[in-house]
Amino acid sequence: MDVTXLLLATLLVFLCCFAAYSHLPPEEKLRDDRSLRSNSSVNLLDLPSVSIVALNKKSKKISRKEAENKRSSKKEASKQKVARPRTPLSVPCVSTRGSCKPPAPACCHPCASCQCRFFRSACSCRVINVNC
């Protein structure tokens, strides 16, 4: 092996290691508490303390009841929003589970939609949302 190729390979490895570790900050070794106090810019005594408060069983029951009330009110609101006037049935329409291939008219049921399978060779009207 040529000496210059060996020297270039060593230099390449050194540069790779230097590039990998150059972004890391140097570690400071603190010898005692005095150097810690002099080096730190923030005084630890000035920071507010953190207090942890345990919840009692009564407060947990109240929050659970409130959550259940919120859930029930949301369900009632969603049921009220769903109720909407249905469109009158048009005479030329396809019944539920009937064939609705693209030249056919729309489905009779207002909540039904035409679903096709096998590259639009088999199409039928199906109700997707039962609570519509």
Curated annotation (Swiss-Prot):
Name residues in a coiled coil: none
Which residues does the UniProt record annotate as the domain Agouti? 93-132
Q: Which cysteines are joined by disulfide bonds?
A: C93-C108, C100-C114, C107-C125, C111-C132, C116-C123
Give the SUPFAM superfamilies listed for this entry. Answer: Agouti-related protein (SSF57055)
GO process annotations (BP): hormone-mediated signaling pathway; melanin biosynthetic process; melanosome organization
Q: Where is this chain's protein located in or outside the cell?
A: Secreted
InterPro entries the record matches = Agouti (IPR007733), Agouti_dom (IPR027300), Agouti_dom_sf (IPR036836)
In this record, what's one Pfam family? Agouti
Query: Sorted alphabetically, which SMART domains does this protein's record hold?
Result: Agouti
Query: Which PROSITE patterns does the UniProt entry name for this protein?
Result: AGOUTI_1 (PS60024), AGOUTI_2 (PS51150)
The molecular function terms in GO held by this entry are:
melanocortin receptor binding; neuropeptide hormone activity
Q: Name one GO cellular component term.
A: extracellular space
Query: What does the comment on domains in this protein's record state?
Result: The presence of a 'disulfide through disulfide knot' structurally defines this protein as a knottin.
Q: What does this protein do?
A: Involved in the regulation of melanogenesis. The binding of ASP to MC1R precludes alpha-MSH initiated signaling and thus blocks production of cAMP, leading to a down-regulation of eumelanogenesis (brown/black pigment) and thus increasing synthesis of pheomelanin (yellow/red pigment).
- Please report the name of this protein according to its UniProt entry: Agouti-signaling protein
Query: What is the organism of origin for this protein?
Result: Leontopithecus chrysomelas
- High-level lineage: Eukaryota, Metazoa, Chordata, Craniata, Vertebrata
